[in-house]
Amino acid sequence: MKKTTAFLLCFLMIFTALLPMQNANAYDASLIPNLQIPQKNIPNNDGMNFVKGLRLGWNLGNTFDAFNGTNITNELDYETSWSGIKTTKQMIDAIKQKGFNTVRIPVSWHPHVSGSDYKISDVWMNRVQEVVNYCIDNKMYVILNTHHDVDKVKGYFPSSQYMASSKKYITSVWAQIAARFANYDEHLIFEGMNEPRLVGHANEWWPELTNSDVVDSINCINQLNQDFVNTVRATGGKNASRYLMCPGYVASPDGATNDYFRMPNDISGNNNKIIVSVHAYCPWNFAGLAMADGGTNAWNINDSKDQSEVTWFMDNIYNKYTSRGIPVIIGECGAVDKNNLKTRVEYMSYYVAQAKARGILCILWDNNNFSGTGELFGFFDRRSCQFKFPEIIDGMVKYAFEAKTDPDPVIVYGDYNNDGNVDALDFAGLKKYIMAADHAYVKNLDVNLDNEVNAFDLAILKKYLLGMVSKLPSN
């Protein structure tokens, strides 16, 4: 009896001690703020609508982007050298189930190339493709990039001194990647470079426009972006019209909105197929800088100054790009864990809501790091396939999906003059349109849905008007 009583007392003491831990980890929906963010005017075009369909994204960080490690015996060990765990379909399924519709897969290619032509290892390429397929099979969108490849010797480096080797690297690597994925549809997006910058320079992380080295670097980035676009387009197949992402200096908001940055030209017929790539951990002392390095864990959702730390760069992006119908994706954002869950929930909810109001997509940076004093950007525990901070994710999902937007426009296929009817006037207009020497792609004229407007569409429209085809496509 005494042993039984002692056991029960011991059990109760342990159970009572665990209660605070259980309560501390209990889900708290009340942390998610109720926001009313005024919606900006968003142009209606294919590029903007495409990005809208991506909804919300998640980064498979510290995985294929790893370029060193202590336990690497074969090249596939790079995948686990930083995160410690191999990517599985179960992980991607959990990401999809939580509400993410896009996965960005950062890849560092330079440890896996050989020879003067930068031949990519088939073993590495096959494994990357396998994980891409995990996402594609879930009907998710995928962004594939070149990540930690900014290197004077092994990769590319955006300065005039290294432009010859940089151009060769970018064109060689992207020709191979594009060829491998040429038959993938628009669910796969290519991102030419990740945070291109002058590594080791005093202005590595800030585009100081009074510095001639920085201006030279921006001009080189412009050229490398153009080389990337030209290379991918030249491989043909679905790459001829694939959506592509291009960054400015260090992929910062200022890098993309300064007067020296130029978006690359695209081939005729591609309208708004080039997406501006931006990374923004703003304000950095809260979102990215660890407490041990002088960061802060404070950010007040009701303070106008703190709000402006988010809205200033989004307004700049909106004014230069999305308000003009040029799509933008924030490929990396987030807030490191500083034992400040409530603040991070409010910050990420506010961040996504403000971006959504401006037609900008957000992709959460997740490096699977949950301990220590550094960049604790871990959100999804890849071993348990559970989100450690579900309130943060649910806040992001809430405002990525529920922000007030105009309804998708009704597309009347074959309606050349946009009067709501399809008749002989539209046939005459489409015929004249096709005979023009150079014409842009117009979605509602593509009546056979092959991503081209040509004589085949005219023939189908004729059959429809003659009663030989019962109906045209609809959205």
UniProtKB/Swiss-Prot annotation:
It is an enzyme of class 3 (hydrolase). The keyword Hydrolase applies. GO terms for biological process: cellulose catabolic process. It catalyses: Endohydrolysis of (1->4)-beta-D-glucosidic linkages in cellulose, lichenin and cereal beta-D-glucans. The biological conversion of cellulose to glucose generally requires three types of hydrolytic enzymes: (1) Endoglucanases which cut internal beta-1,4-glucosidic bonds; (2) Exocellobiohydrolases that cut the disaccharide cellobiose from the non-reducing end of the cellulose polymer chain; (3) Beta-1,4-glucosidases which hydrolyze the cellobiose and other short cello-oligosaccharides to glucose. The C-terminus (AA 411-475) may play a role in organizing the cellulosome complex. This is Endoglucanase A. The gene is celCCA.
